[in-house]
């Protein structure tokens, strides 16, 4: 083939088993070639290989450790079927001859493929598809088997590997049409809890490029065996293992019937359970052993229910339960077929009907086998197949660990509990559901006409994904209006403040303010003389007199209504049925209870003093109160409150002689009370010191101290101050109205604040979208999106935190779409250093030098066109035309050295033109899932058969699944 062949045989030949016979069959059907294969199968293949390939794979130069010089006839090829398949794949995939060498003419390539295929069909394989061996139940299968055996209404343990939870039975409950709207969600990051006190064994490993049900990875270590044994006991001992949650409780665990002996009852129950648990007929000695085990517990005093639990946990601890044998012996083959079908489609043990046809040996009848598979596809338990195969085939579990750099896209992980992954993962799974339910061609997984989108996905694909812009001009205009309104009201408040300052000044000295004419000198002299007498006498407080309750319509009514002569109290006067009464029990300094709702009480007393003096009155009330001194209202509050001491305090200037105190307490709903305490106010020390000095001997400062103090307490100014305080209260109330209006006015808000509000609102909008469960069916109007390749799930999980990974995307396509996984890179090849080189290089340009390494070129020539074709999608699957450095995205390439494309639409069209390759790859994946092992050259013939039988209808999903299941148990 030339001198530049790769030195890695596996890379050159594309190690996988796929894509081979379609080309041969197509050519034969077209009648374009004439082959004499019956006379000498493989003769043409040997001839073509010798003419075109020995140059690189023979003589002094043996590239890829493949020497074809000894190849003389087809017998050499039949001896090495794996090499035979590798040659077919390399030629079919056009990886051979390598780039830079002469390309085989299409007719020659087709002739070579056909001849190699005929040789493969003549290989005498030793084993059947259902090979001998055992397979342990994986977590998913174990959970489902336990649920079905006991008809449990909850999962045994949490299953984060279940990526989609369907809230409607649309898979089998409709008429072959998916609903326009479905309710689904992904609970993978917050899985529903299983049974209490039940701990699962660790999550199962994935086979390389495979599934979690593969025999070679489902091993059993001593630690894992111990976990299985503990699990079996914990299930039946769980508080959730009750008659309410176990559907077979009555048949398996209830107390025995009166018509049988205890041994007969246990034996009867265990016979049914063992048959289903072991999934095959049970020997008498096995049944007897478990029966005796249960009886041993009843003989120790346990009741039948607990004894059956012990026996059942022993059954679940048996390898015959948690292992699936793969025996090809005729006696149990039907039951192995039943288990294979059941665990493939239902992820669980066979049901009664499946065991029945197995016991009757009917599964060997092709018609019965096919009808059985079709029945199983219609059973609701097929949802478990949809929960396992599509997820693992598309490698979607990798998506759940994706965490893009918030600096690149902040919305992906905006909600830690509901990241974008829980929405994205549902799109490809719903597409698979739709193709299955509507039995569409599997080609539509690549190029569908519909998809299912949530509001979040609609925004993700179609919108700018940013908050709405703000109108700076409108904001500034609005701020001007707001500022003017605030300034207007603030001017009024300022005017009130000015008036209040003037009133406060007048209250301090009403004489200077001109509000009253009074000779304070005479009053001060009289007051000074009285202070000498004050020290010789104490306050004389009369007992309280009380009248009430006076009923009213409301608290406000009770507070405002004058039920007695409040300015001139007459203790002899009667008011209706009420009269003043002595109340010797009302002691100062205590809270006194009153009765009646919506009413008022009055209490009255006198305070006698030989000289004018100051006292402090401390009040408490439930609810409102008014206080009069010598007929003058000196304080009031109209409110609802509970009583407490010292809620309000007043300074009272008592005149020499007798002073009258009237206290009104008003109540709303319920009981009420009051508190009263009077105490003399000591003179300030400077005043006391000045009074001790003879009047003629006082200095200016002492005279000022006394005049200032008297000015503050002068009885001559009391009325003026009362009026001024009323005016002050009115001004305060009026100012409060304006201030409240001012406070309620919207404040100017900066443009930056508006942007922040818009961002917060948009963030909340996105958070709400991330929690939506409803997905709507939408037509694919934008051909850039749709299908299992160009969706946010696949594109996100094949990217890094900060940039896309074209190679990872290429690997995903070769593995998932073409079932052609590349060889791992050589150990001596360093990874790409993204920090090297100029910052303005594109990722394609950075990879250019990497691809120049001969050890890398082979794989990269296949992977790079696939990965770079998707570079218009950023790390989260959103469309972009340029990189962050401003450079345009270049997606041009060639698919399989045949299909040249300039954009992603042409790339997708190229994939569609290779639909038969995809179909064959899909069948290969599904067959591997069904047989639970890596495929062999023999399986290539099985795949040919499946492809042939489903090709006419374009490989309809249900037909493909049926045929794969049918062939997998032959």
Question: How should each PLM-predicted stretch be described?
Answer:
Residues 19-32:
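Bacterial N-terminal signal peptides
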Residues 597-607:
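Short beta-strands within extracellular/lumenal beta-sheet-rich domains
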Residues 626-628:
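Beta-strand signatures of extracellular beta-sandwich domains
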Residues 587-591, 602-603, 645-649:
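Short structured motifs
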Residues 1-17:
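N-terminal secretory signal peptides that target proteins for export/translocation
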Residues 40-66, 79-86, 90-95, 99, ...:
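Low-complexity, glycine/serine/threonine/alanine-rich intrinsically disordered linker
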Residues 29, 35-41:
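Boundary at the C-terminal end of the N-terminal hydrophobic targeting segment
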Residues 637-638:
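Short hydrophobic alpha-helix segments
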């Amino acid at each position: 083939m030339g001198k530049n062949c790769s030195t890695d045989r596996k890379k050159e030949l594309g190690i996988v088993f796929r894509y081979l016979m379609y080309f041969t069959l197509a050519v034969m059907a077209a009648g374009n070639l004439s082959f004499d294969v019956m006379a000498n199968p493989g003769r043409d293949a040997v001839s073509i290989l010798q003419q075109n390939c020995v140059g690189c794979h023979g003589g002094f130069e043996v590239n890829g450790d493949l020497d074809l010089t000894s190849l003389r006839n087809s017998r050499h090829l039949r001896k090495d079927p794996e090499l035979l398949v590798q040659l077919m794949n390399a030629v079919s995939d056009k990886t051979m001859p390598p780039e830079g060498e002469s390309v085989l003419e299409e007719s020659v390539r087709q002739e070579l493929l056909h001849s190699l295929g005929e040789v493969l069909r003549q290989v005498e394989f030793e084993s059947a598809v259902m090979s001998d061996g055992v397979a342990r139940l994986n977590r998913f299968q174990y959970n489902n088997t336990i649920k079905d055996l006991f008809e449990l209404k909850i999962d045994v343990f949490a299953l984060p590997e279940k990526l989609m939870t369907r809230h409607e039975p649309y898979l089998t409950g409709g008429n072959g049409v998916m609903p326009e709207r479905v309710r689904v969600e992904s609970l993978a990051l917050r899985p529903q809890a299983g049974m209490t006190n039940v701990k699962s064994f660790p999550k199962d490993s994935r086979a390389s490029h495979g599934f979690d049900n593969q025999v070679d990875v489902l091993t059993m270590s001593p630690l894992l065996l111990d976990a299985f044994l503990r699990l079996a006991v914990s299930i039946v001992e769980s508080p959730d293992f009750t008659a309410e949650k176990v559907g077979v409780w009555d048949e398996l665990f209830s107390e025995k019937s009166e018509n049988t002996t205890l041994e007969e009852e246990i034996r009867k129950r265990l016979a049914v359970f063992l048959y289903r648990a072991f999934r095959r007929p049970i020997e008498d000695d096995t049944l007897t052993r478990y029966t005796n085990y249960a009886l041993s517990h009843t003989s120790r005093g346990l009741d039948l229910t607990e004894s059956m639990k012990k026996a059942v946990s022993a059954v679940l601890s048996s390898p015959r339960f948690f292992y699936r044998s793969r025996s090809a012996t005729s006696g149990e083959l039907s039951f192995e077929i039943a288990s294979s079908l059941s665990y493939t489609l239902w992820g669980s043990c066979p049901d009664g009907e499946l065991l029945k046809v197995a016991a009757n040996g009917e599964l060997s009848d092709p018609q019965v086998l096919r009808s059985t598979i079709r029945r199983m596809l219609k059973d609701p338990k097929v949802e478990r197949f949809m929960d396992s195969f599509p997820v693992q085939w598309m490698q979607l579990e990798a998506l759940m660990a994706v965490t893009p750099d918030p600096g690149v896209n902040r919305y992906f992980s905006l909600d830690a509990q509901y990241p974008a992954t829980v929405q994205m993962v549902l799109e490809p799974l719903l597409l698979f559901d739709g193709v299955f339910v509507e039995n569409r061609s599997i080609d539509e997984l690549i190029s569908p006409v519909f998809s299912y989108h949530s509001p979040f996905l609609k925004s993700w694909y179609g919108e700018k994904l940013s908050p709405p812009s703000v109108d700076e001009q409108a904001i500034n205009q609005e701020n001007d209006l707001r500022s003017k309104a605030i300034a207007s009201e603030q001017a009024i408040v300022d005017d009130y403040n000015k008036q209040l300052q003037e009133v406060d000044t007048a209250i301090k000295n009403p004489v200077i303010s001109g509000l009253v004419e009074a000779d304070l000198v005479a009053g001060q002299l009289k007051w000074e003389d009285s202070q000498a007498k004050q020290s010789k006498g104490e306050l004389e407080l009369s007992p309280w007199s009380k009248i009430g309750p006076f009923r009213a319509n409301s608290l406000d009514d009770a507070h405002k209504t004058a039920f007695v002569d409040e300015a001139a109290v007459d203790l002899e006067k009667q008011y209706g049925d009420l009269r003043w009464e002595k109340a010797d029990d009302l002691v100062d300094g205590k809270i006194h209870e009153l009765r009646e709702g919506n009413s008022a009480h009055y209490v009255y007393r006198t305070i006698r003093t030989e000289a004018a003096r100051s006292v402090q009155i401390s009040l408490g009330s439930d609810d409102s109160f008014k206080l009069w001194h010598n007929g003058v209202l000196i304080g009031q509050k109209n409110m609802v409150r509970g009583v407490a001491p010292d809620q309000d305090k007043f300074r009272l200037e008592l005149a020499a002689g007798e002073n009258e105190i009237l206290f009104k307490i008003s109540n709303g709903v319920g009981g009420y009370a009051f508190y009263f305490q009077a105490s003399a106010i000591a003179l300030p020390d400077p005043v006391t010191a000045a009074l001790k000095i003879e009047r003629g001997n006082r200095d200016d400062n002492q005279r000022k101290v006394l005049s200032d103090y008297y000015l503050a307490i002068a009885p001559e100014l009391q009325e003026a101050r009362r009026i001024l305080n009323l005016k002050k209260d009115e001004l305060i109330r009026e100012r409060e109205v304006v201030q409240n209006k001012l406070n309620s006015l919207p404040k100017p808000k900066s443009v930056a604040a508006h942007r922040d509000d818009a961002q917060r609102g948009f963030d909340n909008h996105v958070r709400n979208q991330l929690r939506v469960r409803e997905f709507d069916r939408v037509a694919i109007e934008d051909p850039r999106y749709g299908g299992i390749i160009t969706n946010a799930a696949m594109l996100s999980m094949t990217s890094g935190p900060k940039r896309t990974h074209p190679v990872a995307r290429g690997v995903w396509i070769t593995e998932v779409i073409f079932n052609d996984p590349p060889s791992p890179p050589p150990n001596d090849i360093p990874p790409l250093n993204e920090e090297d080189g100029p910052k303005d290089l594109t990722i394609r340009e950075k990879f250019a030098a990497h691809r120049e390494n001969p050890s890398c070129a082979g794989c990269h020539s296949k992977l790079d066109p696939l990965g770079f074709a998707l570079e218009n999608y950023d790390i989260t699957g959103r469309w972009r035309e340029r990189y962050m450095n401003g450079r345009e995205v270049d997606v041009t390439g060639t698919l399989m050295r045949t299909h040249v494309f300039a954009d992603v639409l042409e790339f997708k069209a190229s994939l569609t033109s290779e639909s038969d390759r995809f179909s064959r790859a899909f069948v290969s994946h599904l067959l591997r899932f069904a047989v639970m092992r890596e495929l062999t050259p023999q399986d290539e013939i099985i795949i040919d058969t499946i492809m042939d039988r489903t090709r006419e209808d374009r490989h309809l999903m249900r037909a493909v699944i049926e045929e794969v299941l049918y062939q997998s148990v032959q």
